């Protein structure tokens, strides 16, 4: 019981820090579906997150959420799409929001791995759609280092954060492109 309270306290501290400060990091996102292919798909970019707000760039795409509007810009098509996402869509986009929604329906496990703390959330039943959610954080700083989402049917998504840091400054969580074609779906 004591371990569960410590694990829950670590997660709540992480979530509270993300509400108060902006997490800025480079990232590598890797997905692999063992049933379809053994070749992983890998993407790199950078991100900023503050509460529910986020901004990320990778290859020829930018995405941002300012708390109301989701902005997605494609360099290839020079198109800026604006939409109002549902809570479910936001949860699927932001792994920290996803972890928060999993807390009530999961059991927790925690273990020290060097200077990191690894927290594993395992759903009580299969209705969550995943097998487990693994979060690694730097113990001393509460900086997230990696997230693994083990989904049903052999799909694994890994988000590795490099050069992660907290800052008091928040970037713009909106995208404005003067010459872009705007597709407003709000």
Regions found by a protein language model. Name each.
Residues 40-43, 58-59, 66-67, 128-133, ...:
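Short, surface-exposed coil-to-beta transition loops
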């Amino acid at each position: 019981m004591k371990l569960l309270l410590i694990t829950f306290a670590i997660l709540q501290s992480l979530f509270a820090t993300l509400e108060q400060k902006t997490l800025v990091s480079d990232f590598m996102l890797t997905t692999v579906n063992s049933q379809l292919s053994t070749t992983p798909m890998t993407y790199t970019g950078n991100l900023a997150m503050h509460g529910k707000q986020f901004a990320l760039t990778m290859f020829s795409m930018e995405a941002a959420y300012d708390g109301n509007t989701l902005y997605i810009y494609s360099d290839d098509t020079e198109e800026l799409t604006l939409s109002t996402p549902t809570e479910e869509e936001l949860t699927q986009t932001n792994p920290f929001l996803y972890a928060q929604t999993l807390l009530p329906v999961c059991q927790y496990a925690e273990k020290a791995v060097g200077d990191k703390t690894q927290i594993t959330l395992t759903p009580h039943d299969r209705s969550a759609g995943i097998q487990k959610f693994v979060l690694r954080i730097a113990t001393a700083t509460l900086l997230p280092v990696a997230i693994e989402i083990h989904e049903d049917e052999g799909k694994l998504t890994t988000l590795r954060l490099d050069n992660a840091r907290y800052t008091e400054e928040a970037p713009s969580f909106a995208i404005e492109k003067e010459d872009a074609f705007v597709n407003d779906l709000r």
